[in-house]
A protein has these predicted regions:
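Short, small-residue-biased leader/transition segments that mark boundaries at the very start
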Residues: 2-6
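Glycine-rich phosphate/diphosphate-binding loop of Rossmann-like nucleotide-binding domains
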Residues: 9
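Glycine-rich hexapeptide-repeat left-handed beta-helix
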Residues: 12-13, 18-206
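Terminal amphipathic alpha-helical/low-complexity segments used for targeting or macromolecular assembly
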Residues: 129-434
């Protein structure tokens, strides 16, 4: 059973529709695959691989010859896979969580990094897969990249909260393994590479260069430096999260206890990670499964499905293995060499990163309550009436649900970090007394 699939006035040819997809309002599609919870209305899809939560709602939107997931396609968004030479032979990838603004356009082949915002027309075949959470914006017929800018966007965080709530699958046997995490080995590995790339650009082109060239895009000097800072904050947040999860609620009375809590619990996890249309998994594990299938002619689909489910269940254990593998690079120590003092420093770095990113979200949300945002209110009244109308509809900034959530998140995470620091300081005192 594929769950609830709506097919009202939809024209489809040679398509596979996953669980809880919603297709309606004269949508047309051919030669395409839709994973679960996709929503498609009014527009058109031609030869696409639509991962979970691919959403296109507008009559003028075309998705063609691309791989997408967790996509929000704006009205008039389209791509071209034909350069009028050898036919429609080109294709592209827009990695998970990206948004295309109204009238955006990409000339395939191209590759866009995870959780990116695409605005304007891009015809020079950019590859921004190494720069997740970025803005890709056209200005003066050039593609400008703003690395990491989406990390401080309210919209990105709201999307991450909405996706799990919008899982409409009713079948207890959920066919797609979906990991909703914004920060994972998959995105953090790209940020680490991004930091190296951005620092390399500074060294090769000079720190005072006004602009830098990267994969058919232009990065402004200020954007490059902010990108390094944002990626660094995100890595601190992710690494700290992983360590705190390991020690949360876990009593330890001496150093041996502490290191026992930090031991690896899965042999898999090192190396590159990939996004298999919702399933975030180590690449080597998938390669091993492919080798098993090739070497076993009697292999069944059920066995492969069991493999995917097992990888999904083991995610956090494999994630910890990956985190430990990059500790020498990030902290200069292996996990078994971490002292209580080291962990206290890591937790403080984590707390600073969490609060810094949350304050950026807070400031981003405030823009929605600015004077410019009030222009559409009040119809024909005075400024005072306009402000009154705005407040009746939108409420006050401090009372906004998202703003309250950000403030509470800062409080909760600070308390969580302080609780662990207190326990570690008590351990240090205990060790020194002996």
């Amino acid at each position: 059973g594929l769950g609830d699939v709506y097919k009202r006035q939809v024209v489809m040819s040679r398509c596979f529709i996953g669980q809880a997809c919603h297709l309606t309002h004269l949508f047309s599609a051919h030669d395409s695959l839709f994973f679960s919870n996709c929503q498609s209305e009014n527009g058109e899809a031609c030869a696409i691989f639509a991962g979970p939560y691919t959403v296109t709602m507008h009559k003028s939107s075309l998705l063609i010859a691309g791989m997408f997931s967790f996509l929000n396609a704006g009205s008039g968004s389209n791509q071209s896979n034909h350069m009028y030479k050898l036919g429609p032979i080109h294709q592209g990838v827009v990695e998970r969580g990206s948004k295309t603004t109204s009238d955006s356009y990409i000339l395939w082949p191209a590759k866009v990094g995870a959780f990116s915002l695409i605005m304007g027309r891009h015809v020079n075949h950019p590859d921004t897969s190494g720069m997740p959470f970025s803005y890709l914006i056209e200005h003066g017929n050039r593609s400008y990249l703003v690395p990491g800018a989406n990390l401080k966007s309210v919209g990105t965080i709201r999307d991450a909260q909405k996706w799990p709530k919008r899982d409409k699958r009713t079948d207890p046997d959920k066919l797609d393994c979906i990991n909703f995490n914004l920060l994972s080995p998959y995105t953090i590995q790209k940020m680490l590479q991004g930091i190296d790339t951005l620092q390399g650009l500074k060294q090769t082109s000079g720190e005072t260069s006004e602009c830098y060239s990267f994969q058919s895009t232009t990065i402004k000097n200020s954007s490059l430096n902010k990108g390094i800072d944002l990626y660094t904050l995100a890595v601190h947040k992710f690494m700290g999260n992983s360590i705190i999860k390991r020690l949360e609620g876990a009593p330890f009375s001496d150093l041996n206890d502490l290191h026992d809590r930090l031991k690896l619990t899965d042999s898999l996890g090192e190396g590159e990670w990939i996004d298999l249309s919702g399933l975030i998994v180590p690449k080597q594990a998938v390669k091993d499964e492919i080798d098993r299938i090739v070497g076993n002619p009697d292999s069944t689909l059920e066995e492969t499905e069991s493999f995917f489910q097992a990888m999904h269940r083991r995610y956090y254990d494999m994630e910890w293995t990956w985190v430990c593998s990059i500790m020498p690079r990030w902290y200069g120590k292996t996990v078994d060499r971490l002292s209580p003092g080291d962990i206290i420093r890591i937790v403080r770095q984590w707390n600073e990163a969490v609060v810094s990113l949350d304050r950026m979200l807070y400031d981003d949300a405030r823009k929605e309550f600015s004077m410019i945002s009030r222009i559409g209110f009040g119809v024909d009244g005075s400024t005072r009436q306009r402000d009154f109308d705005f407040e009746q509809v939108r409420g006050e900034f401090e009372n906004d649900a998202f703003v309250k959530m950000v403030c509470k998140h800062i409080e909760d995470k600070t308390a969580l970090g302080n609780e662990l620091i207190d326990r570690l300081e008590a351990l240090i005192t205990s060790i020194s007394q002996h």
